[in-house]
């Protein structure tokens, strides 16, 4: 009989298995906690949406829409797309459920997988994990600064240090049309290929975001948006920077920054980490004052960010750090016999009720095999129980780091374990 073939994860789609999955969860939860502390409520979004939502909201000239989306027809012949980013879906939900007609700003956070058909490379996956926030309904530079500070606090709370915040302004409706004309005039004088020229006609900022060396060299002297800001847009940007200074959030103004989505206006920012090489971005975002109206809602402003969980894990690794503990449990039970197993199963459940993570050696292993399993679990303590312990009414507690072992009465084992672990 031939052996059945096996399967692998799709190209560019990572698995997270223990112990690495523990770090992934710690990073995701750490970034989410920073948003929760700032009053952002959780929103759960569909994995797929109407394709038109992203075409209209993200921008048809972007690489995301033109090259990277997973789009297909469902059984009802409707065109749907696996979500490539979170903001458009959040705005759709806010409009659909009338959240924009309540207290403003609407502050929401989300976490989960997003999908882009990119060339797989280190930290750049086709299924990427993000934590994001959106603050909708108030055009206030102080809110811009708060959103940025939440992201900064999320990274620092995980112990990440070697990152920097780059920030710029993409202007407003007053100054962007004039700048667009000036930039197109510059670009059309260059020997651009047909595809790049087409992009310059639709959205010339996309050309400044081109990663090809020859295009970057040709556009090195392109006019900059920061030099063409209206008085209102400049005042807004200056106030954002003043708030960041007051909050103690360090930044670098990068006048050449262009984000990969078309909806950004005014404040735009990115967090980068040089330990990741060419793919240095670990998160970013900005203000999108026209997006809600573009999607059929009220003309309300908004600002948000998306932080890469996968890339933050890699950034921590580049600094020789990990987030959280990779241990599966804190206590590992080693039963020596069936009666001991029955008693340890009960003790384990009682410890779990106290919030202590506990696992057991199942499968009638010998002492040697059970202790090896205890060491591999990453637990701090092993509970050892044999016939003699049962007869004496005691349980052995072994410190797996030092090898020291003590015996305590069965009645005191819960309290003693809790005291040792500080639970």
Swiss-Prot record:
Annotated Pfam families: HGTP_anticodon, tRNA-synt_His
User: Which pairs of positions does the record mark as disulfide bonds?
Assistant: none
- MF terms (GO), sorted A to Z: ATP binding; histidine-tRNA ligase activity
The record, for PROSITE patterns, names:
AA_TRNA_LIGASE_II
Alphabetical list of InterPro entries matching this protein: aa-tRNA-synth_II, aa-tRNA-synth_II/BPL/LPL, Anticodon-bd, Anticodon-bd_dom_sf, His-tRNA-ligase, HisRS-like_core, HisRS/HisZ, HisRS_anticodon
Q: Name one GO cellular component term.
A: cytoplasm
Q: Does the keyword Protein biosynthesis apply?
A: yes
Reactions listed under catalytic activity: tRNA(His) + L-histidine + ATP = L-histidyl-tRNA(His) + AMP + diphosphate + H(+)
Give its localization: Cytoplasm
- In short, the EC number is 6.1.1.21
Which biological processes are named by the entry's GO terms?
A: histidyl-tRNA aminoacylation
User: Which terms are listed as keywords in the entry?
Assistant: Aminoacyl-tRNA synthetase, ATP-binding, Cytoplasm, Ligase, Nucleotide-binding, Protein biosynthesis
By sequence similarity, the record places it as follows:
Belongs to the class-II aminoacyl-tRNA synthetase family.
State whether it acts alone or in a complex, and with which partners, per the record: Homodimer.
Write down the HAMAP family for this protein, in alphabetical order.
His_tRNA_synth (MF_00127)
Q: What is this protein called?
A: Histidine--tRNA ligase
Q: What is the lineage of its organism?
A: Bacteria, Bacillati, Actinomycetota, Actinomycetes, Mycobacteriales
């Amino acid at each position: 009989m031939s052996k059945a073939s096996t399967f692998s994860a799709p190209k560019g789609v990572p698995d997270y298995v223990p112990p690495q999955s523990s770090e992934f969860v710690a990073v995701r939860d750490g970034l989410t906690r920073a948003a929760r502390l700032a009053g952002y409520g959780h929103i759960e979004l569909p994995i797929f949406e109407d394709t038109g939502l992203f075409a209209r909201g993200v921008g048809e000239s972007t690489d995301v829409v033109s090259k990277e989306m997973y789009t297909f027809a469902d059984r009802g012949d409707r065109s749907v797309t696996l979500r490539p980013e979170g903001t458009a879906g959040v705005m759709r939900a806010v409009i659909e459920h009338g959240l924009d007609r309540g207290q403003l700003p609407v502050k929401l956070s989300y976490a989960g997988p997003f999908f882009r058909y990119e060339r797989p490379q280190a930290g750049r996956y086709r299924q990427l994990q993000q934590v994001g926030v959106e603050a909708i309904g108030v055009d206030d530079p102080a809110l811009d600064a708060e959103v940025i500070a939440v992201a900064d606090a999320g990274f620092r709370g995980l112990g990440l240090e070697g990152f920097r915040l780059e920030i710029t302004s993409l202007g407003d409706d007053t100054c962007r049309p004039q700048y667009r004309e000036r930039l197109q005039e510059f670009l059309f004088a260059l020997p651009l290929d047909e595809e790049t020229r087409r992009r310059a006609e639709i959205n010339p900022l996309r050309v400044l975001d081109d990663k090809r060396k020859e295009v970057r060299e040709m556009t090195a002297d392109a006019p900059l948006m920061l030099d063409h800001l209206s008085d209102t847009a400049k005042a807004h940007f200056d106030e954002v920077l003043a708030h960041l200074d007051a909050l103690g959030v360090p930044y670098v103004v990068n006048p050449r920054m262009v984000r990969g989505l078309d909806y950004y206006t005014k404040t735009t920012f990115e967090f980068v980490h040089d330990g990741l090489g060419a793919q240095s971005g670990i998160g970013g975002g900005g203000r999108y004052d026209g997006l809600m109206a573009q999607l059929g809602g009220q003309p309300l402003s908004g600002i948000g960010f998306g932080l890469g969980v996968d890339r933050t894990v890699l950034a921590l690794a580049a600094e020789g750090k990990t987030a959280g503990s990779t241990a599966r449990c804190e206590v590992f039970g080693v039963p020596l016999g069936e009666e001991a197993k029955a008693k340890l199963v009960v003790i384990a459940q009682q410890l779990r009720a106290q919030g202590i993570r506990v696992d057991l050696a199942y499968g009638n292993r010998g002492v040697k095999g059970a202790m090896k399993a205890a060491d591999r679990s990453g637990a701090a303590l092993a509970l050892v129980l044999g016939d003699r312990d049962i007869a004496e009414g005691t349980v052995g507690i072994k410190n797996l780091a030092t090898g020291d072992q003590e015996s305590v009465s069965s009645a005191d084992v819960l309290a003693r374990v809790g005291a040792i672990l500080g639970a």
